[in-house]
Regions:
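STAS-like cytosolic regulatory interaction modules
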Residues: 1-52, 61-112
Length: 112
């Protein structure tokens, strides 16, 4: 089972370090619930993440969805390259960059 730390740096800033993977994503989500609730703006530094996979991407998207449903802002810094690559391949990278809600990122085609 992988290890991780989620450090509260104060004023809505957090640092996630260690594994962000199938082994840890659910636990990270559980650990983050209470400290995230206290803030309307969140900045999560991911530069300490040492291992990531598609479950890590799913975790970040879950946080974006939660933030939008609870009227909060969420931003990521230090995004792991592997997560960015998976996000680009699956065309959800804009969600991470702009914090859009799932339902709003697909635009309707132009009617002519």
């Amino acid at each position: 089972m992988g290890d991780f730390t989620l450090e509260d740096l104060g004023d809505g800033h957090f640092a996630l370090a260690g594994e962000m993977s199938f082994d840890t994503a659910e636990r990270i989500l559980q650990v983050s619930e209470r400290p995230f609730e206290d803030h309307t703006r969140l900045e999560i530094d991911l530069s300490g993440v040492t291992l990531s996979d598609s479950a890590g991407l799913a975790l970040l998207l879950e946080w974006v969805t939660w933030a939008n449903h609870t009227v909060r802002e969420i931003r990521y810094s230090g995004m792991p390259e592997r997560v960015l690559a998976i996000a680009k391949t699956t065309e959800v990278d804009a969600l991470l960059a702009r914090g859009e809600r799932w339902a709003g990122f697909i635009e309707a085609p132009d009617v002519q």
